Amino acid sequence: SEMCIRDRPKAMSGNIYAFPQSEFGLKGRAFVFGELKSPRLRGGYEVTNLSIPELLLTLKQSDLDFKGHSADFAVRDLMLNGSDMQINGTFSTLPSTNFEISKLDVSSKYLNVDKVMNVSERALKYAPKTPAKTSASSQPADIPVIIYNGSINFARIVTGNIDIRNTQAGISLANNIFNIRNLRTRAFDGRVRGNISMNLITSLLNIRLTGRGIDVEKALLDAAGMKDTLSGTAAFETDISLKGATYEEQMRSLKGTVGFDVRNGQFGPFGKLENLIIAENIRESQLFQTALGGVISGLTTIDTTHFSELKGTLSFNDGICNLKPVTSLGNILSLHIAGEFDLLRNYADMKVRARMASLVSNLLGPIGAINPANLINSAASLNIVTAKAFSIFCEMIPEDEMSAIPSFSNKYVDNAATKFQLVVRGDAAKPLTLVKSFKWLATETEYQSAVDYVNSIPEPVEGSEATTIEEVVQEVDA
């Protein structure tokens, strides 16, 4: 059967019942004709000067034009609590189980996410209460919307202290999955590209992004409020997935990898040598307490925080971030960091191995003297008790592990460079309490040479007041 329905063109004004302060203008007409299973529509409607103060929302104009089996719509100057939005699109008017949008273009000159969320929160207060679920195991219904082809173009997006510019991407929606493809944007003075998809029912999020020229210091400060932690210019690549409504759910479900490369940067307090050397076992040892103050003051003028490159790969699974590994190249200190970080407990458990220039290790006093590589050279003035205890502050590792510690960034060859290892463990919110252990590293040959030398030191004669190895040797020879 066929039908023909026509309304009369008439301008009108009114308000929305649920929002007493609202107002709008409406005019237009529509024709419906053809078969019921495939009706054709002509005409259109125009909404003007919509204002809903309760939602902090205004709309200058919205047009709906029927084109037979489809309709074009346009939203002009939609303001959401100070954020503007322009929307254009086309959807099918044919009867279907899904609302099919063939084209959807969204643009904005300024979008403040936090203020827009305020609009959303206000709207939820007016939404009808959701009926109780009949079964805890019942699955949410599929979203009956398909977006075949769309785009976003946002000149500026602000959330918190994060300011993102020139965001462009293609968008689509099908089978509950919202896709953002060919994303291009500028953030933290750098460029970000990639693809993002999200299942709107399960909240599963897949993120594949690459970044170049990112200001790390700005990113950490603006995004996480972390000041003086790390600086430099970064490139990164992510291939991760996560889901969940809470931070705990998201971190526990987080899977995938993040690779990064930071150039010409600087560590915060953690990279200062005085904070690395003064580990818990050094602080608590009676062997170094009298000399510790002088050692620390001598190190404060040495800059070990700068690096030419910091790079690595992070892998995520079951709430744990694994460093596989992370390395840094500095002029006088290079690092090899491996271990894991518990994202839920904010807890670190890592080993930091370092190559340190000999000119710096020479400033470490008795701590530097018990390095197996230096022990024989510095032994003459070394306390005999300290010398015999060297093995407590030394760890022997295979040659291949030793060679994995990076060289210096300036390609300077320092054959007398020393290597040490830190055990970093504890609450990341207390960075200066994390360094539990400091030990010199030695190959089997270096370690055995030191052991042989210490074993060759004669025992002091009875009643001797000699304290250094040199004094003991002189007494015995006498």
Q: Can you say where each PLM-predicted feature lies in the sequence?
A:
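Flexible beta-edge/linker motif
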Residues: 31, 90-116, 146, 248-250, ...
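Solvent-exposed loop/turn segments connecting transmembrane beta-strands
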Residues: 20-25, 52-56, 79-86, 159-163, ...
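Extended terminal
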Residues: 66, 76-85, 90-96, 104, ...
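Short, small-residue-biased leader/transition segments that mark boundaries at the very start
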Residues: 2-5
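Tryptophan-anchored aromatic micro-motifs
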Residues: 45, 106, 147-157, 257-265
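Extracellular loop and loop/strand-boundary signature of outer-membrane beta-barrel proteins
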Residues: 16-18, 222-227, 298, 439
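Flexible, solvent-exposed coil segments and beta strand-coil junctions
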Residues: 8-12, 41, 65-70, 147-150, ...
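Transmembrane beta-strand segments that form the barrel wall of outer-membrane beta-barrel proteins
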Residues: 9-15, 44-49, 70-78, 151-155, ...
